[in-house]
Curated annotation (Swiss-Prot):
It is a multi-pass membrane protein. InterPro entries: ATP_synth_csu_bac/chlpt, ATP_synth_F0_csu, ATP_synth_F0_csu_DDCD_BS, ATP_synth_F0_csu_sf, ATPase_proteolipid_c-like_dom, F/V-ATP_Csub_sf. F(1)F(0) ATP synthase produces ATP from ADP in the presence of a proton or sodium gradient. F-type ATPases consist of two structural domains, F(1) containing the extramembraneous catalytic core and F(0) containing the membrane proton channel, linked together by a central stalk and a peripheral stalk. During catalysis, ATP synthesis in the catalytic domain of F(1) is coupled via a rotary mechanism of the central stalk subunits to proton translocation. The record marks 55 as: Reversibly protonated during proton transport. It is found in: Cell membrane. Pfam families: ATP-synt_C (PF00137). The gene is atpE. F-type ATPases have 2 components, F(1) - the catalytic core - and F(0) - the membrane proton channel. F(1) has five subunits: alpha(3), beta(3), gamma(1), delta(1), epsilon(1). F(0) has three main subunits: a(1), b(2) and c(10-14). The alpha and beta chains form an alternating ring which encloses part of the gamma chain. F(1) is attached to F(0) by a central stalk formed by the gamma and epsilon chains, while a peripheral stalk is formed by the delta and b chains. Belongs to the ATPase C chain family. PROSITE patterns: ATPASE_C. Keywords: ATP synthesis, Cell membrane, CF(0), Hydrogen ion transport, Ion transport, Lipid-binding, Membrane, Transmembrane, Transmembrane helix, Transport. It comes from Clostridium beijerinckii (strain ATCC 51743 / NCIMB 8052) (Clostridium acetobutylicum). This is ATP synthase subunit c. Gene3D superfamilies: F1F0 ATP synthase subunit C (1.20.20.10). It comes from the Bacteria.
């Protein structure tokens, strides 16, 4: 087995971190809206921004995995 395949598998694991991060952020956003429903628009704005930042780590991991497999 090539070390590139192993490295690509480890790089894809960044998707797990992104999923956990988005899950925690969504839970906290729902909790915040439950406490203050009038602030739901602002909470959702920050949630979407945070989710996008979490998702970039998964995208970078996927790109790195493709680059490592292309060697």
């Amino acid at each position: 087995m090539s070390l590139g395949v192993l490295a690509a598998g480890i790089a894809v694991l960044s998707g797990i971190g992104a999923g956990v991060g988005i899950g925690i952020a969504a839970g906290k956003a729902v909790e915040a809206v439950g406490r203050q429903p009038e602030a739901s628009g602002r909470v959702m704005t920050f949630f979407i921004l945070g989710a996008a930042l979490c998702e970039t780590t998964a995208i970078y991991g996927l790109v790195m995995a493709f680059m490592l497999m292309g060697r």
